[in-house]
């Protein structure tokens, strides 16, 4: 056995131990919780206040100058109202509205780039103040003192073919009213089927004027929309790489 292999063996053991420790930390408490739920269906999340969730941050957007409210004493209609007696649409914190998620995206992009260039230059001095007497003993041709030749080429191709579709409805709650009257909404829906939970999260900013008379709004009219559709359970566990493989993918440079 060479002395080099014996010298590097402790280092390999230390690296392996470090990788195992990182993998254990990466799994953390979630692995312990999942071990305690073996053979059981995944639990649904508790219904919590969205503003009290960890990491919640109030939305801040550019606002126009405040306008003085105008009142019409001889009018039976309230400004912005769509109903004769009362506006049933969401307009304050805690109100509910239905978000119609209708996403149909299709993209087909193809790019192709070709580039080539060839350059050649010759430079020399045939005779300059008796330079031949110096170059002849050195066997140097004065007319070809410098010769350069370069060639470069590039060929690239790329294509994108994507098609996505998502159609569903989800109820959202108004979590914040901005100074200009726009509403910050957030909705979450969980559906458990056997041992898999499907999650749908919708959040964004809506204009009260875009809310329909039946208290619904299309997802295309939500500004800063954040729509997430995924799941957790046995199927997602199989689809994801193991913790050790994920750690190795992050740490290994090759």
UniProtKB/Swiss-Prot annotation:
The keyword Zinc does not apply. It comes from the Bacteria. One of its GO terms (molecular function) is cytoskeletal motor activity. This is Flagellar L-ring protein 1. One of its GO terms (biological process) is bacterial-type flagellum-dependent cell motility. One of its GO terms (cellular component) is bacterial-type flagellum basal body, distal rod, L ring. Residues 1-26 form the signal peptide. It comes from Bradyrhizobium diazoefficiens (strain JCM 10833 / BCRC 13528 / IAM 13628 / NBRC 14792 / USDA 110). It is found in: Cell outer membrane; Bacterial flagellum basal body. InterPro entries: Flag_Lring. Assembles around the rod to form the L-ring and probably protects the motor/basal body from shearing forces during rotation. HAMAP family: FlgH. Belongs to the FlgH family. Keywords: Bacterial flagellum, Cell outer membrane, Membrane, Signal. The basal body constitutes a major portion of the flagellar organelle and consists of four rings (L,P,S, and M) mounted on a central rod.
